[in-house]
Amino acid sequence: MCIRDRFGGVGDKKEKVKYFNYSEFDSPDVQGSGQMMNKLVLDMLDEVREKFDKPIHINSGYRTPQHNEAVGGTENSSHLKGLAVDITCDNSIDRFDLINCLLDVGFSRIGVAKTFIHADIDPDKVQGVMWTY
């Protein structure tokens, strides 16, 4: 199934996310903006958390255009659409396990940095890619 077929809408404020609070995905400049995260991304992250079997810290979720610019994000950042997350990860063992979990649940775009992993499902971008920062 292609990612475009699985692509869902923005999360409903009444829907429950099992392992996360919507506030964990807030852009730091707008309280409550984590509600802009795509529901499929949240469901996939719950699956990742289940498989990873350890707490996951979201470093960046939804971003407002202002915050995205402030952190040096690209103009077409998937964070602006609620389709991306950056997960804190600073050791090789967890990094390996977390990447495997992300791939297992269907994240098809992964960026690897020294202290975080970026994962997104943006259907407007090339799929099946992994890069380093």
What are these regions (language model features)?
Residues 42-72:
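Extended, low-complexity, intrinsically disordered C-terminal regulatory tails
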Residues 6:
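Periplasmic peptidoglycan-binding/tethering modules of Gram-negative envelope proteins
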Residues 1-3:
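Short, small-residue-biased leader/transition segments that mark boundaries at the very start
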Residues 76, 80-81, 85-133:
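Catalytic cores and adjacent binding grooves of peptidoglycan-active enzymes
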Residues 11-32, 79:
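Acidic/histidine-rich, surface-exposed loop or edge segments in extracytoplasmic proteins
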Residues 29-37, 88:
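Second-shell loop/turn segments in exported
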Residues 37-44, 94, 98:
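Stable alpha-helical elements in mature extracytoplasmic
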